[in-house]
Amino acid sequence: MELSITLIIIIITSLISLSAMGNHKMMDELIFYPPSVNRGQWYRFFSCGLIHADLAHLGFNMLSLYFFGIGTPTHLSEGPAYSGVEYMFMWVFGNQGKWIYLGMYILALLVALLPSYLKNRHNYHYRSLGASGAVSAVIFAGILFDPLSGIGFFFIPVFIAGFIYAILFLVISQWMERRGRDNINHSAHIFGALFGLAFTFFACRYIAGFNIFNYFLELIRNANPSDFIQFGSN
């Protein structure tokens, strides 16, 4: 497998995140901080996606990006070589697919944080970091392509269909955002996920002439209900 866009993102993000964890000055220069954005430092919308709070935060995001961005070999004679979104984009859009995928990832960093910025633009105590918004965009783009693929949780042998996971993810994230009792930017997860859906739909529709929403619904309509929840290895 050639070095993919996803792998390049993972390598760069991991190197910068690890460097920033031991360097407070570097962390302060890259973190999303609305008052600094107000002073013209718009790069923070993007640079904050290159840093993470700790190894668990970094590991979870990069593993999720790997599984949904690259996926596993499909062994198909026709179709994408791997099941991940980057390769699905190349299947739909041809050689420009990897660049459209990269564009989605970068734009998702911005779009996911816009609501947080508007809400906290004068809040001198607010900071945010991590690639979760962009990773959520990739995950939800993947669910559009394969709504029945089982999504599980670490060490729990239960897998639910992607489209059910998407609904639960949005509902729970919205509930936790309203509670506001943790230090997680659930808003970035929600808007990153919604952007991933919208970007993939419009790109497929207007660049490739492919109605992915009809494709998505057809897969669900033709599915066996037993595919929605599976126990054991997926």
Where are these regions (language model features)?
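A detector for small-residue-rich transmembrane helices and their helix-helix packing motifs
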Residues: 1-234
